A protein has these predicted regions:
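Cytosolic covalent-transfer regions centered on His/Cys nucleophiles
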Residues: 1-187
Length: 187
């Protein structure tokens, strides 16, 4: 009977770790949905000004704001994430400026396009930020899933363009529920 103890203990530890992983993912998803924001801003905002507003919207601390702005600028130098043909920009980065994943949408107050030349053709700037921490793969997978939905599901982009905050939050919740169910199936 004694020889079976280590296997049982290992199984318990594996299950405990799985529970911790599920709990972590559930908390990240809940936070992302609750903290989602639709921010209406001046249609004349430039790319630089938008980045400042993104930073200010995430944290009151100037050093963290700078981390967010720098991370988004760095990511943009790797290749533009502006898609004027689809009227949106996808600005995403990993940064120590945030403690949890972020999904925020900036749109002009007018509901039309941004007017600044460096924002030409853009009706919505979608911001996705993830923290620099040990759960990089989990957060990247979740935000990657949302990026995929932007491309695959016309309803998602249409709702971002024309909907209100609660409409977008509702879709986020629906998509992340599907993501979470898939996540549970893999564990």
């Amino acid at each position: 009977e004694y020889e079976h103890m280590p296997a049982v203990r290992q199984e318990d530890e594996t299950f405990t770790r799985q529970l911790e992983e599920v709990n972590y993912m559930a908390a990240q998803i809940k936070s992302l949905i609750q903290r989602f924001q639709l921010v209406r801003t001046d249609e004349t905002v430039t790319f630089e000004e938008l980045l400042v507003r993104v930073g200010e919207g995430q944290t009151p601390y100037a050093d963290r704001q700078k981390m967010i702005i720098d991370a988004l600028k760095r990511r943009e130098t790797m290749g533009s994430q502006f898609f004027p043909d689809f009227s949106f920009a996808l600005l995403h980065a990993r940064t120590a400026g945030v403690a949890r994943p972020v999904f925020t949408v900036f749109k002009p107050e007018t509901g039309k396009q941004f007017l600044s030349p460096d924002m030409k053709g853009i009706r919505a700037a979608i911001i996705m930020l993830m923290p620099e921490e040990e759960h990089v793969n989990e957060n990247a997978s979740m935000l990657g899933y949302l990026s995929q939905k932007l491309v695959e599901e016309d309803e998602f982009l249409n709702t971002i363009m024309t909907g209100e905050e609660e409409d977008i939050r509702g879709l986020l919740s629906r998509y992340l529920k599907k993501y979470f169910n898939r996540y549970l199936d893999k564990i």
